[in-house]
Amino acid sequence: LIDHFSKIFLESIMNDKLFPLYLAGGMSTEQFYGIDAFQKNILNGIGTIAFPLFCLLLSEGFFYTKNRKRYIGGMLAFALISEVPFDIGFFSRYSIAEGTFPFYLQYQNVFFTLFLGLLTLVIIEKVALKISGDGRKSKVTKILCQLGVVIIMAIIAELVKCDYGSQGIVYVSMLYFLRKSRLLQSAG
């Protein structure tokens, strides 16, 4: 929320109000660039840190939830509910021009990425349960099928135009596969 507030409100204030004031001499260079650096480095930086944490919590929550259908349903519901304010905040001028207001169909919020990531984990686990056996051939088949699921879901994320796109799906999946190694998870 902090980075979205920064991008929606502070960026427009910087461009519409403070930059003309700076150009007119009503604000010093230090003042203008100090506010700009705070907005871009601090507030947007908080948002950059948030996504990996969301992915970690999602993959960990996948193991600890008692009702995965409800978990997926809740994530989808939150993605749909949060899409309207997201689209209005970031893309209202485009959606009005396209006649789809309040929806902008060319970009989806981060919760769609998290929803698809969660769905990927469910499918990966179902594939692992379907392909049983302890032999080397079974393990290779299982890994290849799970990798195929990740690739297909990453393509879907790109087609739907989710925030973080295929990278988000790969990141959630990577945290799932590396869940027993905290050292490798932190390197991601």
Outline where the language-model segments fall.
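Alpha-helical transmembrane segments and their immediate juxtamembrane cytosolic regions
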Residues: 1-188
